[in-house]
Amino acid sequence: MPIGVPKVLFGSPGEEDAAWVDIYNRLHRERLLFLGQELDSEISNQLVGLMVYLSIEDKTRDFFLFINSPGGWVIPGIGLYDTMQFVPPDVHTICMGLAASMGSFILVGGEITKRLAFPHARVMIHQPASSFYEAQAGEFVLEAEELLKLRETLTRVYVQRTGKPLWVVSEDMERDVFLSATEAQAHGIVDLVGDENMGDLV
């Protein structure tokens, strides 16, 4: 039997009475954000809105973005990535479970030195996919050109943020490359592999 989203007591500073709020609302107020599903326009817009609003509220407190995502749409992912670079607070990215495809792109977009993977997390990178089989000939050519531009954009970001040569990143993106947490660290996608002391970071 579903129980819905758990609620917790929360009182803002200066308020006498605490109120029951859903747990995600409470966590968001502590700058703890979650990408726990396929990335689409809706979840991207929610995370962008939270980052912008909370940045206006306080420009000094870092964000912690927990990622467990199979990937998703490229354009909403790029929008979220750009927002992470735009907002004044640093964005810590934390991979738990799986960060695949656009999930790994968001993971690598965290503040350099503040990207972390849990010990048993998995990371997967590959080139952007398309629905060519649904397109007419003219649409196919236009979509292929756009896809090539998107691939170049993603590749440049991975090169810039991992410190790996262009040829290494390009080769990795030719196919699905699955990495353990330590392999992701060696690839420069994350900076740290979490241990029992990582709770001190949040």
UniProtKB/Swiss-Prot annotation:
Q: What's the gene?
A: clpP
**Name of this protein:** ATP-dependent Clp protease proteolytic subunit
Keyword line: Chloroplast, Hydrolase, Plastid, Protease, Serine protease
Tell me the compartments it is located in: Plastid, Chloroplast stroma
PROSITE patterns with a match to the protein in the record:
CLP_PROTEASE_HIS (PS00382), CLP_PROTEASE_SER (PS00381)
Q: Does the keyword Protease apply?
A: yes
Q: Which residues form the active site?
A: 101 (nucleophile), 126
Top-level EC class: hydrolase
GO terms for cellular component: chloroplast stroma; endopeptidase Clp complex
A Pfam family (short name) is CLP_protease
The EC code for this enzyme is: 3.4.21.92
| Described purpose of this protein according to its UniProt entry | Cleaves peptides in various proteins in a process that requires ATP hydrolysis. Has a chymotrypsin-like activity. Plays a major role in the degradation of misfolded proteins.
Q: GO BP, one example? A: protein quality control for misfolded or incompletely synthesized proteins
| Coiled coil location | none
